[in-house]
Design a protein with these regions (language model features):
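Bacterial N-terminal signal peptides
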Residues: 16-27
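Alpha-helical, heptad-rich or low-complexity scaffold/stalk segments
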Residues: 36-95
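Exported/periplasmic cell-wall-interacting domains
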Residues: 215-280
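Primarily a LysM-type cell-wall glycan-binding module
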Residues: 41-66, 99-128
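Gly/Pro-biased beta-strand-loop elements
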Residues: 155-242
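N-terminal secretory signal peptides that target proteins for export/translocation
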Residues: 1-11
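Extracellular LysM carbohydrate-binding repeats and other cell-envelope/extracellular binding modules
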Residues: 74-107, 130-163, 279
């Protein structure tokens, strides 16, 4: 009996120890491990950050844009103060557009030799891109091309995600975030419709057809700005603005409103049938 009682006591102590570990020690260990992964896995000092940024600046001045982009992407993986991360992200996104609007070939572009009978609109249609993007990528100031010319053509699939909770539009190239833009979305009573749509038409200097009136592109009363990208949901789209102070707020009639310089950039990049996903 004494031996049995001793075994029982040992067993109970073992169970108590196991339960203590399960209830208290394991969560503490998991929390510590998670903290190490998120806050100290990739530490970097301000001195190291400044040195890296100076090196990137030298690369940019030397025209080594792709190497500079890679360095930015590496830096963003480090543990950084929120303000530094935001600055780096903006610099990377601006560089993304600079590379896109240059003749530098990337993994999502292809070289093309102009053939007899070619025209920019034919090439754009063939590769599901835009005339504007071909011109910007090859620094062309007119539509005329000649046989034998070498062109950089984008083969990326672009998509757009609009988050109405923070009034931000994200442009993706395949699955890589290319650039983030501030926007205005629907005000109270005129919400921006949540869902997935496609761009079905694109207009330069659009006419505004509002209830009971037609407002010409050159009228100060035309709030559509310089570009229109219409959705598969009739009456809705992405457009510019004559009210730049509203960007970043819920102020539109339900459409996605952008600064004119931003919508012109977006307009040049995305072709018809681009997917637009609106989330909250």
């Amino acid at each position: 009996m004494l031996f049995t009682r001793q075994i029982t006591q040992i067993f109970k102590k073992g169970i108590t120890t196991f339960l203590f570990i399960l209830i208290f020690a394991l969560p503490l260990f998991a929390e510590t491990a998670a903290s190490n992964l998120t806050s100290s896995r990739y530490p970097i000092s301000q001195t190291e950050l400044k040195t890296s940024l100076d090196e990137i600046d030298k690369l940019l001045k030397a025209g080594s844009l792709l190497e500079a982009k890679t360095r930015y992407q590496t830096l963003i993986q480090y543990d950084l103060p929120k303000a530094d991360r935001k600055t780096l992200r903006k610099a990377l996104e601006d560089l993304n557009i600079r590379v896109l609007f240059s003749p530098i070939e990337t993994s999502d572009s292809l070289p093309y030799t102009v053939q007899s009978g070619d025209a920019l609109f034919k090439i754009a249609k063939k590769y599901n891109t835009t005339v504007e993007l071909i011109k910007k990528s090859n620094h062309l100031d007119r539509d005329a091309i000649r046989s034998g010319m070498k062109l950089k053509i984008s083969k990326a699939v672009y998509s757009i995600v609009v988050d109405v909770s923070n009034n931000m539009l994200k442009l993706f190239s395949d699955k890589e975030l290319l650039k983030t833009y501030p926007v205005a979305t629907g005000r109270t009573g005129h919400p921006t419709p949540i869902g997935s749509y496609t761009v079905v038409n694109k207009l330069v200097n659009p006419t505004w057809y509002k209830a009971g009136a037609v407002v010409s592109p050159d009228s100060p009363a035309n709030i559509l700005g310089t570009r229109w990208l219409g959705f598969s949901l009739s009456g809705y789209g992405i457009h510019g603005t004559t009210l730049p102070e509203t960007i970043g707020s819920a102020a539109s009639e339900g459409c996605i409103r952008m600064l004119n310089e931003d919508v012109e950039e977006l307009f040049a990049i995305v072709p018809i049938n681009t997917t637009v996903k609106i989330v909250d």
